[in-house]
Amino acid sequence: MDHKPLLQERPPAYNLEAGQGDYACGPHGYGAIPTAPPPPPYPYLVTGIPTSHPRVYNIHSRTVTRYPANSIVVVGGCPVCRVGVLEYCFTCLGIFLAIVLFPFGFLCCFALRKRRCPNCGAVFT
């Protein structure tokens, strides 16, 4: 393999004048971005004696009613310690009736359950 430099000639200069090089614009600006037309003149108001009365603004004050902050109520929260969440537990009588009266005993079992707080141990019927 030959180790020859890839470019034999020097690259073109960056400061090209009009009419030189492949990418330069022609003498008439062919390919150049046209300039935008100037914006229309701003309509100025004629100063003089005002023909209408000055505006009057009425400022009305409103009364602001402040409500107390809402308290967060946890559904199923313990009313005694306010930390634990109440869990359902079945009573011994409910479990006994569920076994003895098999198909209909489940109704008795669910009717005889209690709510218990695992944090403070309070029991609610």
Curated annotation (Swiss-Prot):
It comes from the Eukaryota. Keywords: Cytoplasm, Lysosome, Membrane, Transmembrane, Transmembrane helix. Pfam families: BRI3. It is a multi-pass membrane protein. The keyword Nucleotide-binding does not apply. One of its GO terms (cellular component) is lysosomal membrane. Coiled coil: none annotated. One of its GO terms (molecular function) is identical protein binding. It is found in: Lysosome membrane; Cytoplasm, Perinuclear region. Participates in tumor necrosis factor-alpha (TNF)-induced cell death. May be a target of Wnt/beta-catenin signaling in the liver. Interacts with BRI3BP. Interacts with MGAT1 and IFITM3. This is Membrane protein BRI3. It comes from Mus musculus. The lineage of its organism: Eukaryota, Metazoa, Chordata, Craniata, Vertebrata.
